[in-house]
C-alpha cells in the first residue's frame, strides 16, 4: 500500500496530528480516512467550495479525455510540442537520485515517468490531487512507476513539516481558491534547503503571437492571471519561461 516512511509522514490535514493505521484506513481523533483501490482519500475540508469545487467536478469528468484532447487540440491551439516542453521543465528542477518528492496536482500523470527517471527506482515518489478521476488516470498510465497516490487538497497538505526533499507542481496554481496558501503549504512540507517548484500557464514578456494570445485568453483566462507572489521563505530563486513562452516555472530552495 504505502511505504513505512510515508505512513510516518502522513498527518491529519486539519490539525497536522499524527494518524494511526487501522487495517486499510487511517484514524485521527475518531475520524477515519479510507484507502480504496490503493488511494488514500484524505480531503480537507469536507465541503470543498469555490473554484476548487468547480474545477474538481470538471477534471473528474474530463480526466478520461485528457490525452485525446492534448493530442488533437494541444499542438493546434498552442503551437507547442508539449512532450518536449515537459522534458525541459523536468530538466530545470535539479532533482537527484534517491530523493523523496511530492508532486501536487499531477493530473493524469504526464510528468511522472520523467520525474521517476530523475529520482531513480529507490526514490520515494508521492503524488496528491483533489481529482479522484485524475488519480485513476495516473494509475492507468503509470502503474509500474511505484507512485504513491493521495486524494487530498493542495491547500491542506496531509504531511508533516519538512517531509520531502523536493516538491513539484505545474498547471494548477491559477485554479486554486488561494494560490498563496497553496504555495505556503508547498514550502512547509519540504525540508530546509529542499527544492520547491511551481508553475502554470502565462505569457512571457517576449511572447509576440498576438493572434494566438487572444485566442488562448478567450479559451483560458488563466493565461492572463498575475503570477502568485514568491514568499520570503525561499531563496536561490530561478524563474524560467517554458512551453515556448506560454508558461512559467519557479524553482527555489527553502530557507
Predicted features along the sequence, with ranges:
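Class I SAM-dependent methyltransferase SAM/SAH-binding core
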Residues: 100-156
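A short acidic, Gly/Pro-enriched loop at the edge of an enzyme's catalytic core
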Residues: 155-166
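A short SAM/SAH-binding and catalytic strip from SAM-dependent methyltransferases
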Residues: 166-178
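A short glycine-rich, Lys/Arg-flanked "PGG" loop and its adjoining helix->strand segment in the class I
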Residues: 180-192
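Short alpha-helix
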Residues: 218-234
Amino acid at each position: 500500500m504505502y511505504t513505512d516512511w510515508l505512513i510516518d509522514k502522513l498527518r491529519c490535514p486539519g490539525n497536522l496530528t499524527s494518524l494511526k493505521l487501522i487495517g486499510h484506513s487511517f484514524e485521527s481523533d475518531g475520524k477515519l480516512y479510507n484507502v480504496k483501490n490503493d488511494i488514500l482519500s484524505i480531503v480537507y475540508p469536507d465541503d470543498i467550495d469555490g473554484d476548487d469545487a468547480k474545477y474538481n467536478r470538471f477534471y473528474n469528468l474530463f480526466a478520461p479525455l485528457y490525452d485525446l484532447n492534448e493530442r488533437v487540440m494541444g499542438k493546434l491551439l498552442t503551437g507547442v510540442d508539449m512532450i518536449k516542453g515537459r522534458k525541459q521543465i523536468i530538466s530545470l528542477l535539479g532533482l537527484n537520485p534517491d530523493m523523496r518528492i511530492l508532486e501536487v496536482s499531477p493530473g493524469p500523470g504526464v510528468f511522472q515517468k520523467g520525474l521517476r527517471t530523475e529520482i531513480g527506482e529507490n526514490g520515494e515518489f508521492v503524488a496528491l490531487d483533489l481529482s479522484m478521476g485524475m488519480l485513476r488516470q495516473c494509475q492507468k498510465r503509470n502503474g509500474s512507476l511505484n507512485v504513491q497516490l493521495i486524494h487530498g487538497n493542495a491547500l491542506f497538505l496531509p504531511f508533516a513539516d519538512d517531509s520531502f526533499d523536493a516538491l513539484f507542481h505545474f498547471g494548477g496554481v491559477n485554479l486554486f481558491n488561494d494560490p498563496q496558501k497553496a504555495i505556503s503549504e508547498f514550502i512547509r512540507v519540504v525540508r530546509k534547503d529542499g527544492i520547491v517548484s511551481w508553475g502554470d500557464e502565462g505569457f512571457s514578456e517576449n511572447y509576440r503571437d498576438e493572434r494566438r494570445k487572444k485566442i488562448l485568453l478567450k479559451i483560458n483566462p488563466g493565461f492572463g492571471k498575475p503570477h502568485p507572489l514568491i514568499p520570503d521563505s525561499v531563496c536561490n530563486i530561478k524563474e524560467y519561461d517554458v512551453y515556448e513562452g506560454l508558461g512559467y516555472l519557479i524553482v527555489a530552495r527553502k530557507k
